UniProtKB/Swiss-Prot annotation:
<feature type="topological domain" description="Cytoplasmic">
    <location>
        <begin position="1"/>
        <end position="20"/>
    </location>
</feature>
<feature type="topological domain" description="Periplasmic">
    <location>
        <begin position="345"/>
        <end position="353"/>
    </location>
</feature>
<keyword id="KW-0997">Cell inner membrane</keyword>
<feature type="transmembrane region" description="Helical; Name=11">
    <location>
        <begin position="389"/>
        <end position="411"/>
    </location>
</feature>
<feature type="topological domain" description="Cytoplasmic">
    <location>
        <begin position="439"/>
        <end position="452"/>
    </location>
</feature>
<protein>
    <recommendedName>
        <fullName>Inner membrane metabolite transport protein YdjE</fullName>
    </recommendedName>
</protein>
<keyword id="KW-1003">Cell membrane</keyword>
<feature type="topological domain" description="Periplasmic">
    <location>
        <begin position="44"/>
        <end position="57"/>
    </location>
</feature>
<comment type="similarity">
    <text>Belongs to the major facilitator superfamily. Sugar transporter (TC 2.A.1.1) family.</text>
</comment>
<feature type="transmembrane region" description="Helical; Name=10">
    <location>
        <begin position="354"/>
        <end position="376"/>
    </location>
</feature>
<feature type="transmembrane region" description="Helical; Name=9">
    <location>
        <begin position="327"/>
        <end position="344"/>
    </location>
</feature>
<feature type="topological domain" description="Cytoplasmic">
    <location>
        <begin position="321"/>
        <end position="326"/>
    </location>
</feature>
<feature type="topological domain" description="Periplasmic">
    <location>
        <begin position="115"/>
        <end position="117"/>
    </location>
</feature>
<keyword id="KW-0472">Membrane</keyword>
<dbReference type="InterPro" id="IPR011701">
    <property type="entry name" value="MFS"/>
</dbReference>
<feature type="transmembrane region" description="Helical; Name=8">
    <location>
        <begin position="298"/>
        <end position="320"/>
    </location>
</feature>
<keyword id="KW-0812">Transmembrane</keyword>
Length: 452
């Protein structure tokens, strides 16, 4: 495996232009539709139960099929992306999701729907990881955090989008239309990616395909020079004299030396994200009801509290490049841990609402930091997708078992204990991140790739 630092330096000196906006548009559109299809399942299941298509057992199988697909996709997508290219991995998984979602619109029974849901999950698990990880290789280091966060901001509108469209489509048409809309949209993204999603020059150079990387990058440079009416600045003497380095890209490097440290930090970061995300967002309505708030009011209060999610991601995009990554992530975890406990001891509805809103605001700032920004930055180019894929797969496993732990604590000890245990775990994760995390803010991917 070869790595060519000059290619990275030339990508980092580019001013933002239509080239970057097209890449951003294709990936963000794909992530939005992926989220739409994922959250549409929640809306569709209620309809399937009411019309006799499904029951609690089949609903569980439907949900588990998606989660298992996510797990498989996260692992396989990383290998495809590192061995065969970012563009090919992205487009293959777009096609899988598009065909599976379209097929789900025409299934004859629930068993076929569960099968297509698994295929959707496999493609979406890979697509999310490949999208975020690939994006980091195109965006200049000085604004990489901000634009990766914006990618997350667009993608996280999908719950509201699926809920809004689902209310109309399922009521007046059919649940099948939800999958058909998502499938057609994904296939449109697949078509557009064929025209505008180029192969990562960093990946080409890393594979020793220097001529291909040079051709792709020179074309981009010429487009930007014409668009901006400028001449790109020359590279520094260090950048222009960068040498080719040979690195073997075996998957097992993730568990050796410096890479093991990064792998463990990444797993810790995602464990913190998943246990907080699934504890807080999934169980908020239940905790409301257990606190004596009626169901209708709990649903309304949950909707109000979740407004903090897009606002948190929006603010994260504005400020994330102004603070060191380790400080930013660990501080957010400490804030969430403290707010979680304060939130759990509130008894008045207005206090629950205010503290819940603020907690969700900071939680989604952390979700943005972890999934969209920090994790994709941690890895050398030749391991980026496999590293991201593996730690995301571990995160999926944690997400599967977290609800059972929360349910046991909630049943035997109450909601305050749930948030106390969560707080202790988040504080431990913050400690690991602050001590062992590596700093990636405004650092070129080539510098981050250095393995000591």
């Amino acid at each position: 495996m070869e790595q060519y630092d000059q290619i990275g330096a030339r990508l980092d000196r580019l001013p933002l232009a239509r080239f970057h906006y097209r890449i951003f548009g294709i990936i963000s559109f794909s992530l939005l539709l992926t989220g739409f299809l994922s959250y549409s399942g929640n809306v569709v299941l209620a309809k399937l139960v009411s019309n006799g298509w499904s029951n609690n057992f089949l609903n569980a199988a439907f949900t588990s099929a998606l989660m298992f697909g996510y797990f498989i996709g996260s692992l396989t997508g990383g290998f495809i992306g590192d061995y065969f290219g970012r563009r090919r991995a992205f487009r293959i998984n777009l096609l899988i999701v598009g065909i599976a979602a379209t097929g789900a619109a025409f299934v004859p029974d629930m068993y076929w729907l569960i099968f297509f849901r698994f295929l959707m999950g496999t493609g979406m698990g890979a697509l999310i990881m490949v999208g975020y990880a690939s994006f980091t290789e195109f965006i200049p280091a000085t604004v990489r955090g901000k634009w990766s966060a914006r990618l997350s901001f667009v993608g996280n509108w999908s719950p509201m989008l699926s809920a809004a469209i689902g209310v109309v489509v399922i009521a007046f048409f059919s649940w099948r239309i939800m999958f058909l809309l998502g499938g057609i949209g994904i296939l449109l993204a697949w078509f557009l990616s064929g025209k505008y999603f180029i192969e990562s020059p960093r990946w080409l150079a890393g594979k020793g395909q220097i001529a291909g990387a040079e051709c792709q990058l020179r074309e981009v440079e010429q487009q930007i020079e014409r668009e901006k009416s400028i001449r790109l600045p020359p590279l520094t003497s260090y950048q222009s004299n960068s040498k080719v380095k040979v690195i073997k890209g075996t998957f097992w490097l993730l568990f050796k030396g410096e890479m093991l440290r990064r792998t463990l930090v990444a797993i810790t970061v995602l464990i913190a994200m998943n246990i907080s995300l699934y504890t807080i967002t999934v169980w908020i309505p239940t905790i409301f009801v257990n606190s004596g708030i009626d169901v209708d009011k709990s649903i309304l209060m949950t909707a109000v509290i979740m407004i903090g999610a897009p606002v948190g991601i929006f603010i994260a995009a504005l400020i994330i490049d102004h603070f060191p990554r380790r400080l930013f992530g660990s501080t957010l975890l400490i804030i969430i841990a403290v707010l979680g406990y304060i939130y759990s001891i509130q008894t008045t509805e207005w206090a629950i609402l205010i503290y819940g809103l603020v907690m969700i605001f900071f939680l989604y700032m952390y979700v943005c930091f972890a999934s969209a920004v920090y994790i994709p930055e941690l890895w050398p180019t030749h391991l980026r997708l496999r590293g991201s894929g593996f730690v995301n797969a571990v995160g999926r496993i944690v997400a599967v078992f977290t609800p059972y732990g929360v349910a046991a604590l909630l049943t035997h000890y109450g909601s305050i204990t749930v948030f106390m245990v969560l707080g202790v775990m988040l504080l431990l994760c913050a400690l690991v991140l602050s001590i062992f995390g590596i700093e990636t803010r405004k650092v070129s991917l080539e510098e981050i790739s250095e393995v000591n």
